């Protein structure tokens, strides 16, 4: 272990769509958590790794906490709360453009039993007038004994370096858990599937997003500069399959083009992406289907 090397695990907690994934991608400098304006975008805890010369922070981006309406929803909330027993610090992220609501209070109640340092992170300050920020800080200030309060813009990067510096100073001396050039502990197959699912969320209508899972069936390196990726998009109804395929296959082609570009950035090679769409009724409420589609809580 290096002398005076600080390391540890930090959970990012918050209501859906407060910008947790945007912050994580900002910190590690590459897209590993998918972003969308649709709720429940992040379904598994994704570990992003930030490393500098004398410190390493392993971030866990949890699914947004919400009132569950299906077994998948139960999994997502349990997944978010289970991280609180595993970490050295917690970032409680709130949206500066929204009033404090029941979802925030739900999280605050669960954080009252956490003995680790809790940071209040007020995100999206680039979207509000500075005068409003003081009101937001006052609204949250007495809800918990926060280690620090950081107003940030994950999108623009405002105050993100200062937040990282504070976390480094908070973490104990410890080992470097991962190599310096590693930014996540998830395999390429998992991230490729998430990038494809992001494009489905971006491009399809409201009916589809919560009913979509992606299984990457195969990643095969055909030569030194070419990678074949084969994946199946799983939906619950035939009508959703029709939306994703689109007229003459146009929508599926758009999804493929956009996803391929991001996968190429991740892999650093030319990618041939083949996509299929499969109907699997009620997969969100069947435990066996959840596990087959990658929702195994112990894995993350």
Curated annotation (Swiss-Prot):
GO terms for cellular component: cytosol; plasma membrane. Residues 61-64 are annotated as: G3. The keyword rRNA-binding applies. The keyword Cell membrane applies. It is found in: Cytoplasm; Cell membrane. Residues 123-126 are annotated as: G4. One of its GO terms (molecular function) is GTP binding. InterPro entries: G_ERA_dom, GTP-bd, GTPase_Era-like, KH_dom-like_a/b, KH_dom_type_2, KH_sf_prok-type, P-loop_NTPase, Small_GTP-bd. Monomer. Belongs to the TRAFAC class TrmE-Era-EngA-EngB-Septin-like GTPase superfamily. Era GTPase family. This is GTPase Era. It comes from Ligilactobacillus salivarius (strain UCC118) (Lactobacillus salivarius).
